Amino acid sequence: MCSWCWGYRPTWQRLQEKLKTTVEIQYLLGGLAPDSDVPMPDEMQTFLQQTWHKISQQLGTEFNFDFWSRCRPRRSTYPACRAVIIARKYGKEQAMYLAIQQAYYLQAKNPSDLDTLADLAAAIGLDKTLFKEQLTSRDIEQKLMDEITAARNLPIRGFPSLVLETDDRQLPVALDYHHWQTSYDNTISHLQNKTSDLL
C-alpha cells in the first residue's frame, strides 16, 4: 500500500528480470501503519490523492480515484503486510503483492479491510477460511514485527528502496523510477567493488 511502490512497479519488474541471474531478490515489509478502525483524517486523504496525481503525471501510473468516494479510508497497512507473509508461506508472495496493489489502486477496494484481503487470498488460490484464521494469529503478527525491525535496520529512508547485502555489508542501491539501468549499473558496481576488495 505504498503509492510510489505502485508507480515504480514497471521499472522494478524490468530490473528484476535483468538481475535474476546475478543476485537473490528478497522482499522486506516496512509496516508503515498499525491496525486501526479510525477514519483517515481529511488532510491525509487530500495529501494522498495529490500524491496519486503527482505519480500519475510523472510516471504515467494508472489510479482509480473512485477509491476515495467508495471506500472508508483508514491509515492501516499492517493487515495487508500480514496477508503477504501468509501468501509467502505458500509460494504466492508476488501474487498477493500484485492482488493488493490492483485492488487498491485500480479496483477501488480497501486492503485495510480483512474481508477484502480474504477475497484476494481466495482469488490467488489460498484457502479463504484458513487465511482468515492466520491473518489474526500471533505467529504471523510476530513475523511481521520481526520483518519491520529488520527493514528499519537497513540503510534506507523510505519506500521503495533497494539494498544490496553482501557477506559483511548492506549497501543502498540508487533507485530511478524511469530507468532500470541506473539501479542495475549501481548493483553491478557494488558487486565489482566487493570482488576488488578480495583481491
Listing of model-derived features with the role each one plays in the protein:
Residues 4:
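Short, cysteine/histidine-rich loop/knuckle motifs that typically chelate Zn2+
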Residues 8-18, 23, 102-199:
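C-terminal cap of thioredoxin/glutaredoxin-like
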Residues 9-104:
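Structural alpha/beta surface segment adjacent to cysteine/selenocysteine redox centers
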